Amino acid sequence: MGVPRPDGFFGNCDPKNKKNYRTRCSALIKIRNNMNILIDTAPDLRQQLLRHNIKNIDKVFYSHMHADQTHGINDLRSFYLKDKKQINIFADITTSKYLKKNFSYCFNSFSKEYPATLKLNLLKKKITINNNSNKITIRSLKVKHGKVDSTCFILNNKLAYISDISDFYKKDFKFFKNLDYFIIDCLWYEFHPSHFNLEKSLYYVKMFKPKKTILTNLSPVLDYKVLKKMLPKNVIPAHDGLTLNL
């Protein structure tokens, strides 16, 4: 949803605090030697790319098919126009079908003037990406997200990125224990059928014992400063532009 909402509603968030201005969730993985991997194409993607001066996108991983994860996809076209190279997209079967149905022009060449700009690849459980002497391993795991599944991503067995979740599958608990970083959905205080609330996020923080936790996907209900005061020392609210080093 972002903060403020399109109607200007800040909810409980103090508009004087810059960390309360939130775009929809996307994450950028920067690998040395200028490789950029994007997780999700939020509707605010153009704004995010310009703000952080991103000049290339090499690969995109999708967590699921919802609009707030996919509807910035058209902004990837600019990088094709610049480099004349299709961008590799990775998505599960459900998300792939949604993307091909709703954004077919991205994946099919209709004319010389409108070539396919993206190449769709089926998401595997584990992918290793090499960039000269640097490499990153991305493990993809399903989590519950209301009536559908979402995909979370674990980078080099150190960082988990889970933007949308209503619960974990118990069989995968072992992958989330003792991570360096645990980036987890936390919509608001009350129960929600498709997202974690604060209580549930902190329940799993206590169970998995990461070194540091970042709460993301925060609604206008959650003011940055108020929320931060409520949290344990190793848990912080996310904010736009937050950078972590692995």
Summary of predicted features, one role per range:
Residues 1-162, 171, 228-246:
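Binuclear metal-dependent hydrolase catalytic cores
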Residues 169-246:
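Binuclear metal-ion centers of metallo-dependent hydrolases, dominated by the metallo-beta-lactamase
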Residues 44, 66, 166, 187, ...:
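Catalytic metal-binding/acid-base residues of hydrolase active sites
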